[in-house]
């Protein structure tokens, strides 16, 4: 039987202790041997990112998952800093920047709003695909394959059984990420 590809799960939540949805998603994932869960806020509370360490983690994994809440139509500040510093020219893009070529990017995002608010004419004015376009473009700039994101809408108001169902789907995808959800 083929081994699943190595997955780096970059988790970025500044108030992780208060996020029931993210705890439910992460708990079963921690049991998967081929998945490295890397909590950016736990590792870098001062925002001083060890760029070389992070780049080595990226080199060592084939699938990169970015799990975070949607903050102001983007990601939390530390993840933005991580993206700007770690995905540097000469490493992930630009001349000689091919370290991530052929790897896979998937965003796993929790939101505080219902799905229907992310549409033209809705409260958030744009569909989620448009809001996530900068992440998709970043993946393309790094020569990575974009996998459709997993979005948990209205995360803090979901019933426990609904969150458990999302967690189960997440684990199933992580067990064979290159054959599901491409």
From Swiss-Prot:
Alphabetized UniProt keyword annotations: Cell inner membrane, Cell membrane, Membrane, NAD, Oxidoreductase
Molecular function via GO: electron transfer activity; FMN binding; NADH:ubiquinone reductase (non-electrogenic) activity; NADPH dehydrogenase (quinone) activity
Protein localization: Cell inner membrane
Catalytic activity entry: a quinone + NADH + H(+) = a quinol + NAD(+); a quinone + NADPH + H(+) = a quinol + NADP(+)
NCBIfam families: PRK04930.1
Cited function: Regulatory subunit of a potassium efflux system that confers protection against electrophiles. Required for full activity of KefB.
HAMAP family referenced in this protein's UniProt entry, alphabetically: K_H_efflux_KefG (MF_01415)
Quaternary organization: Interacts with KefB.
Name by which UniProt lists this protein: Glutathione-regulated potassium-efflux system ancillary protein KefG
């Amino acid at each position: 039987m083929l081994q699943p590809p190595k997955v780096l799960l970059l988790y970025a939540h500044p108030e992780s202790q208060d996020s029931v949805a993210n705890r439910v998603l992460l708990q079963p994932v921690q049991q998967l041997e081929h998945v490295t869960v890397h909590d950016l806020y736990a590792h870098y509370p001062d925002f001083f990112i060890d760029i070389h360490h992070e780049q080595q983690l990226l080199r060592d994994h084939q699938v990169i998952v970015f799990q975070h809440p949607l903050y102001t139509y983007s990601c939390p500040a530390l993840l933005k800093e991580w993206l700007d510093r770690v995905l540097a020219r000469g490493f992930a893009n630009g001349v000689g920047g091919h370290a991530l070529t052929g790897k896979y990017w998937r965003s796993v995002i929790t939101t505080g709003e219902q799905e229907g608010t992310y549409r033209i004419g809705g409260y958030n004015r744009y569909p989620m695909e448009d809001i996530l376009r900068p992440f998709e473009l970043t993946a393309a700039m790094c020569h990575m394959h974009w996998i459709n994101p997993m979005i948990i809408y209205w995360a803090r108001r979901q019933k426990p059984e609904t969150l458990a169902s999302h967690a189960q789907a997440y684990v199933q995808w992580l067990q064979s990420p290159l054959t599901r959800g491409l």
